[in-house]
Amino acid sequence: TGPVDLIVSGHTHSEVRAEVNGIPIVQARSSGTALGVVTLTWDRGHGEVVDHAIHVWTTRHEGVSPDAEVAALVGRWTDEVEAVAERPIARLARPLRRDRDDESALGDMIADAQREATGDQIALVNGGGIRTGLDAGPVSYADVFAVQPFQNALVSLDLTADQLRRALEAVVQDRLGQVSGVCFRFDPTRPAGERVIEAWLEETGEPIVGEGEVVNAGLTFSVTANNFMAAGGSGYDVLAEADGTATGLVDSEVLMRHLSSLPQPVEYEERGRIERLAPWPE
């Protein structure tokens, strides 16, 4: 057999019972609605898996009495977690909404928090990493966790000017990402990979892209992204080419600290970093 004997998959919330190139693959839907069971038959003489059986069993809870010991344990931990989750960390003067089509104050704040935490020149945030908005009033740990639930680690990357241009092209894919430390103008009606018309550093105004081309190919930039993006996720393939350093920081924790450090109640406006030159195509 090859180096892989079994793939246990997730994330898509699908039921998978499959075999590809002799490798069994299982996924048991989501949220405890099913159990995946795979039986592998091991040949001791040859030191390899020689057979397998895949099952996905639907779970049932109707009419089943909870186990008293387990229920007590769940109740205790629920109470302890809720005490922390509902603890207020900040107060918003107005709602902060996510926006998948344009720059948003929430996206700016998240990107600013990450850039401030790492000290890099630029921060890039994938749009899919911002799951919901924040209402006006008290903001709790649970509220921030709902915005960034994946607990992604932050990575510091060194990008060439052309790699940064390509990363900005990934920002303006079908669903817009958010940025800090860089400003740009883009045309969503242009072909993918050719949408960023102009880009420059936010603090100094130093040009990065002009008329769709890199201005100074010899420049390099320090860029913060989460580990999912740094591995090429969400179309950010170019980031996987770059040298990266783990920062030891987690996105949601960084946002919590940033929010609590701001003058209260928090007022956050869009920074005007992203200019869309035409409507998104239908």
Please place each PLM-identified region on the residue numbering:
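Active-site neighborhood of phospho(di)ester-bond hydrolases with catalytic His/Asp-centered motifs
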Residues: 5-13, 25-28
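Glycine-rich nucleotide phosphate-binding loop and flanking beta-alpha elements
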Residues: 14-15, 32
